[in-house]
């Protein structure tokens, strides 16, 4: 048994870990650079961030994956910004705790299609957060009682 475990350990050292890099290996500069540039990347977006008026219901999952712009620009005065967008549908389970009902429905999310490094807003910080309309009320608690 000990010989088997030793063989498996040696095999991992020779072939590398499943991620494709040997544990402790340094990622080459070009790979780091390629992964860090301003581009669309899969991002988890909370359902209530896209649909803030739907606070009375619960959603499963509570977030969905969409492509969003992210990454670094060559200058601190620039921010990675979406220049192309589209609407995409995701199937989400909506639970109405008042009625005790649930149903799977298609909800629309904004997905970024193209990104560019553009000058940051005048405030100097581009938070990317959407401003809440006063008529929408207060946001729902993060851990509602169910």
Curated annotation (Swiss-Prot):
<feature type="modified residue" description="Pyrrolidone carboxylic acid">
    <location>
        <position position="25"/>
    </location>
</feature>
<dbReference type="GO" id="GO:0008083">
    <property type="term" value="F:growth factor activity"/>
</dbReference>
<dbReference type="GO" id="GO:0042056">
    <property type="term" value="F:chemoattractant activity"/>
</dbReference>
<dbReference type="GO" id="GO:0045766">
    <property type="term" value="P:positive regulation of angiogenesis"/>
</dbReference>
<dbReference type="GO" id="GO:0016020">
    <property type="term" value="C:membrane"/>
</dbReference>
<dbReference type="GO" id="GO:0001666">
    <property type="term" value="P:response to hypoxia"/>
</dbReference>
<dbReference type="GO" id="GO:0038084">
    <property type="term" value="P:vascular endothelial growth factor signaling pathway"/>
</dbReference>
<dbReference type="GO" id="GO:0050930">
    <property type="term" value="P:induction of positive chemotaxis"/>
</dbReference>
<keyword id="KW-1015">Disulfide bond</keyword>
<comment type="function">
    <text>Snake venom VEGFs that may contribute to venom dispersion and prey subjugation by inducing vascular permeability and hypotension. This protein induces an increase in capillary permeability after intradermal injection, in a VEGFR-2 (KDR) dependent manner. In addition, it provokes a drastic hypotensive effect after intravenous injection. The hypotension is mediated by nitric oxide (NO), which is produced by VEGF-activated endothelium NO synthase. Also induces angiogenesis in vitro. Unlike other crotalid VEGFs, this protein probably interacts with VEGF receptor-2 (KDR).</text>
</comment>
<dbReference type="GO" id="GO:0001938">
    <property type="term" value="P:positive regulation of endothelial cell proliferation"/>
</dbReference>
<feature type="disulfide bond">
    <location>
        <begin position="73"/>
        <end position="117"/>
    </location>
</feature>
<keyword id="KW-0732">Signal</keyword>
<feature type="disulfide bond">
    <location>
        <begin position="69"/>
        <end position="115"/>
    </location>
</feature>
<dbReference type="InterPro" id="IPR000072">
    <property type="entry name" value="PDGF/VEGF_dom"/>
</dbReference>
<feature type="region of interest" description="Disordered">
    <location>
        <begin position="116"/>
        <end position="146"/>
    </location>
</feature>
<protein>
    <recommendedName>
        <fullName>Vascular endothelial growth factor isoform GtVF</fullName>
    </recommendedName>
</protein>
<keyword id="KW-0339">Growth factor</keyword>
<dbReference type="GO" id="GO:0048010">
    <property type="term" value="P:vascular endothelial growth factor receptor signaling pathway"/>
</dbReference>
<dbReference type="InterPro" id="IPR050507">
    <property type="entry name" value="PDGF/VEGF_growth_factor"/>
</dbReference>
<feature type="compositionally biased region" description="Basic and acidic residues">
    <location>
        <begin position="133"/>
        <end position="146"/>
    </location>
</feature>
<dbReference type="GO" id="GO:0005615">
    <property type="term" value="C:extracellular space"/>
</dbReference>
<comment type="similarity">
    <text>Belongs to the PDGF/VEGF growth factor family. Snake venom VEGF subfamily.</text>
</comment>
<dbReference type="InterPro" id="IPR029034">
    <property type="entry name" value="Cystine-knot_cytokine"/>
</dbReference>
<keyword id="KW-0873">Pyrrolidone carboxylic acid</keyword>
<dbReference type="GO" id="GO:0060754">
    <property type="term" value="P:positive regulation of mast cell chemotaxis"/>
</dbReference>
<feature type="signal peptide">
    <location>
        <begin position="1"/>
        <end position="24"/>
    </location>
</feature>
<keyword id="KW-0964">Secreted</keyword>
<dbReference type="GO" id="GO:0090729">
    <property type="term" value="F:toxin activity"/>
</dbReference>
<dbReference type="GO" id="GO:0002040">
    <property type="term" value="P:sprouting angiogenesis"/>
</dbReference>
<comment type="subunit">
    <text>Homodimer; disulfide-linked.</text>
</comment>
<dbReference type="GO" id="GO:0005172">
    <property type="term" value="F:vascular endothelial growth factor receptor binding"/>
</dbReference>
<dbReference type="Pfam" id="PF00341">
    <property type="entry name" value="PDGF"/>
</dbReference>
<feature type="disulfide bond">
    <location>
        <begin position="38"/>
        <end position="80"/>
    </location>
</feature>
<keyword id="KW-0800">Toxin</keyword>
């Amino acid at each position: 048994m000990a010989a088997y475990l030793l063989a498996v350990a040696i095999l991992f050292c020779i072939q590398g870990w499943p991620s494709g890099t040997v544990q402790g290996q340094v990622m080459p500069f070009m790979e780091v650079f390629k992964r860090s540039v301003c581009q669309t990347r899969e991002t988890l977006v909370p359902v209530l961030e896209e649909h803030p008026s739907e606070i009375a219901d619960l959603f499963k999952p509570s977030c969905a994956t969409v492509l969003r712009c992210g990454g670094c620009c060559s200058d601190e005065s620039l921010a990675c910004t979406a220049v192309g967008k589209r609407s995409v549908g995701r199937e989400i389970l909506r639970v109405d705790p008042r009625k005790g009902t649930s149903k799977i429905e298609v909800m629309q999310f904004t997905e970024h299609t193209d990104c560019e490094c553009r000058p940051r807003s005048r405030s100097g910080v581009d938070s990317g957060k959407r401003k809440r309309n006063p008529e929408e009320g207060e946001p729902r608690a993060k851990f509602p009682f169910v």
